[in-house]
C-alpha cells in the first residue's frame, strides 16, 4: 500500500506506529490529566496542542532540522534542558496545587482552556528526542529513490497523527467518564494528581540525562 508514493512496508509501519503511540509519555499523560480534570473539551484542547506540536516537529525533521540538532550538541542541550525544565515546572505546579488544596478536590483548580492548549504545544515542541525519532523511524519506510520523498514522509506523518488521534480520543473519553467517579472521591483525586505530578518530575529527570 502506498508503494507508488515511495512508502515501503506500510502495514509494518502501521503496526510499529500503533505500538509507539501506546508507549506512555508526558504528552499522553498531559492529555489524560486534562480530560479527567476538565472533561472532553479540556482533553481535546490538550490533544490539539500535541497534534500541532508533533506536526511541526515532523515538518522540521523533513526539513533537515533534526540533522542540525543531532550534529550540534549545544543546540541539542538547549532544547533538552528547556524541555526538562518545562516538565519539572508542570510537575511541581501539579504537586503544589494538589498538596495545598484543602476543602476541595484538586481537580477543581481552574486552568483557562487556552492555557491547556499552549502548555500541550510547548510540551510537545520541547522534546528534542521526538524530532530525531521521526527521522530515524520514518527513513526505514521511505524509498529514497522515489521522485517525491516529501509525499512519502507526509503519508507516514499523517498515519501517525491519525493513530495518535484515535488513541488520545480513547483516553479523553475514558478520562471524562472517570471524572464523574472521582468527582466525589477527593482523596482519590489527590492521589491521582500527586502521581501525575511525580511522573512529570520523573520525565524531566530522564530528559535532562538523555544524550544525543
UniProtKB/Swiss-Prot annotation:
Primary location class = membrane
Q: Which UniProt keywords apply?
A: Amino-acid transport, Antiport, Cell inner membrane, Cell membrane, Membrane, Transmembrane, Transmembrane helix, Transport
Q: Does the keyword Transport apply?
A: yes
TM region positions: 12-32, 49-69, 81-101, 120-142, 153-173, 188-208
- Protein's GO biological process: L-leucine transport
A Pfam family of this chain: LysE
Write down what this protein is called: Leucine efflux protein
Q: Which organism is it from?
A: Salmonella typhimurium (strain LT2 / SGSC1412 / ATCC 700720)
Which gene name does the record give? leuE
Amino acid at each position: 500500500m502506498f508503494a507508488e508514493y515511495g512508502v515501503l512496508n506500510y502495514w509494518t509501519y502501521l503496526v510499529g506506529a500503533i505500538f509507539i503511540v501506546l508507549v506512555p509519555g508526558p504528552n499522553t499523560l498531559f492529555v489524560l490529566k486534562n480530560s479527567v480534570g476538565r472533561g472532553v473539551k479540556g482533553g481535546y484542547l490538550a490533544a490539539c496542542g500535541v497534534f500541532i506540536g508533533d506536526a511541526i516537529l515532523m515538518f522540521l525533521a523533513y526539513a533537515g532540522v533534526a540533522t542540525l540538532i543531532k550534529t550540534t550538541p549545544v543546540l541539542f542541550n538547549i532544547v533538552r534542558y528547556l524541555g526538562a525544565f518545562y516538565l519539572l515546572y508542570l510537575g511541581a505546579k501539579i504537586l503544589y496545587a494538589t498538596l495545598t488544596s484543602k476543602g476541595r478536590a484538586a481537580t477543581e483548580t481552574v486552568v483557562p482552556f487556552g492555557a491547556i492548549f499552549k502548555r500541550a504545544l510547548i510540551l510537545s515542541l520541547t522534546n528534542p528526542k521526538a524530532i530525531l525519532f521521526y527521522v530515524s523511524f520514518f527513513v526505514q519506510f521511505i524509498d529514497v529513490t522515489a521522485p517525491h520523498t516529501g509525499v512519502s514522509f507526509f503519508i507516514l506523518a499523517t498515519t501517525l497523527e491519525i493513530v495518535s488521534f484515535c488513541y488520545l480520543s480513547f483516553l479523553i473519553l475514558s478520562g471524562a467518564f472517570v471524572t464523574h467517579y472521582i468527582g466525589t472521591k477527593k482523596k482519590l483525586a489527590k492521589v491521582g494528581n500527586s502521581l501525575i505530578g511525580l511522573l512529570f518530575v520523573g520525565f524531566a529527570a530522564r530528559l535532562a540525562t538523555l544524550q544525543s
